[in-house]
Regions:
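Core alpha/beta nucleotide-donor-binding catalytic domains of modification enzymes
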Residues: 1-58
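Short N-terminal signal/transit or membrane-insertion segments
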Residues: 17-34, 134-162
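A residue-level signal for conserved active-site and pocket-lining positions in enzyme catalytic cores
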Residues: 25, 125, 172
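Phosphate/ribose-recognition catalytic cores of enzymes acting on nucleotide-derived substrates
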Residues: 142-213
Length: 213
């Protein structure tokens, strides 16, 4: 879960799911194995020294750490980049601190990227993310009305606590389970092809596609 869930009792919307994040890290950086550690009360109250020594080095065998310029860790966020660098030197492992990154004079941050996605500025969001925003979900079979008008549609159930772009219609590309991809047009909002009340849905019209999902 997001640290804010435990610390502040609220869950901010995530930019993507854990599964999507793993795939992105593997694809963009060539990392074969990605582990996400659950943030629980034990981790929240762990002294920053123990976080490095016992968890990262002893448990996971870390030999090189990479962190952002504003990274904080350990009980009450007492660990910071300077302490991380110093501790890594003492323990004989490598450490890199990534400096602040700006684009057009704006600091690249998850908070700003969330703002762009929420307002539907997907081109600019992609520029700050370094890749197109993506969402992986299992197809929800509906009434198959799209097929009756010659355009197959894919209905996706929005994941909990994951940020969706502003309501609207977007040009998209759909990646299928077999690795193929097809162009699509995605509507986020109430479903235009069938009445579904006020429930927010993600409905994609598949172009140049003839098959079953």
């Amino acid at each position: 879960s997001h640290p804010d869930t435990l610390v502040f009792g609220r869950t901010p919307p995530l930019i993507n799911t854990i599964e999507d994040r793993k795939r992105l890290i593997s694809r963009l950086f060539g990392i074969e194995k990605v582990l996400f550690l659950p943030f629980d009360r034990a981790m929240m109250t762990m002294p920053w020294q123990d976080f490095i020594d016992d968890l990262l080095i002893s448990t996971y065998g870390a030999v090189h750490l990479v962190a952002g310029h504003d990274y904080h860790f350990g009980h009450r966020n007492q660990g910071d980049p300077d302490k991380l660098l110093s501790r890594c030197r003492e323990r004989g492992i490598g450490c890199d601190i990534i400096p602040q990154v700006t684009r057009d004079g704006i600091t690249v941050s998850s908070t700003y990227i969330r703002t762009l996605i929420e307002s539907g500025q997907m081109e600019r969001a992609a520029d700050f993310l370094g890749h197109r925003h993506c969402l992986t979900r299992t197809v929800t079979h509906g009434c198959r009305f799209g097929r009756t008008i010659g355009i197959p549609t894919v209905n996706l159930t929005p994941p909990d606590h994951v940020l969706l772009p502003a309501r609207g219609v977007y040009v998209t590309r759909v990646f299928l389970p077999d690795g193929a991809s097809v162009p699509g047009v995605t509507n986020i909002g109430t479903r235009p092809t069938v009445s579904d009340g006020d429930a927010v849905s993600v409905e994609t019209f598949l172009l140049d596609f003839d098959g079953d999902l």
